[in-house]
A protein has these predicted regions:
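Residues forming the flavin
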Residues: 1-173
Length: 173
């Protein structure tokens, strides 16, 4: 049975206040009970044919642990039925494909495993997630000045330069 390298994406979860999303979308009507919870989708095609996009936006949701192997950190998001949590979150990801692994599926799996293990180490080796603000990531900083947004990840977070976890071409995208 042939095994082929399938495109996938890697990245991070961004958390922000649900009220900020709704203010941006609904302006003066934000918070009106007749309006749905605010959602968004962003995408941008960048160099080398890659795409950076948001995925699985969770209004009023939380960030949860989703690792499938010991010694790895993977995050996912979820919203409960009411979607009434203080924060919203979305995955911000960049596409990777066979050219990143010479078309070798084993190299793709090894790449994913290395990222998950690097996240584990960057989080402190105790299943906390590495974290930084979006502004810091874009500036190449590694700062975690939480301000009004308190992370929902149940194991906690550790300040980290997330750009250093991804290969340069993916982080630069």
């Amino acid at each position: 049975l042939p095994l082929e390298c399938k495109p996938f994406s890697v990245g991070f979860r961004a958390e922000h206040l649900q009220s900020d999303i709704e203010q941006s979308l609904y302006h003066g009507a934000a918070g009106h009970p007749a309006l749905p919870r605010g959602e968004y989708q962003l995408s941008q095609h960048v160099r080398d044919g890659r795409c950076v996009y948001t995925f699985c936006m969770c209004p009023g949701g939380t960030v949860c642990a989703a690792a499938s192997e010991a010694g790895g950190v993977v995050t996912n998001g979820m919203s409960l039925h009411a979607r009434d949590g203080r924060n919203a979150n979305a995955a911000v990801v960049v596409s990777v494909d066979g050219r990143d692994f010479d078309g070798d599926p084993a190299k793709a799996v090894a790449f994913q495993r290395r990222l998950e293990q690097a996240a584990f180490r960057a989080g402190g080796g105790d299943y906390r997630a590495p974290a930084e603000t979006v502004g810091s990531f874009l500036a190449g900083g590694g700062k975690l000045d939480l301000g009004r947004v308190q992370p929902t990840y149940p194991r906690g977070v550790t300040p980290c330069d997330l750009g250093g976890l991804l290969p340069g071409e993916l982080s630069a995208a």
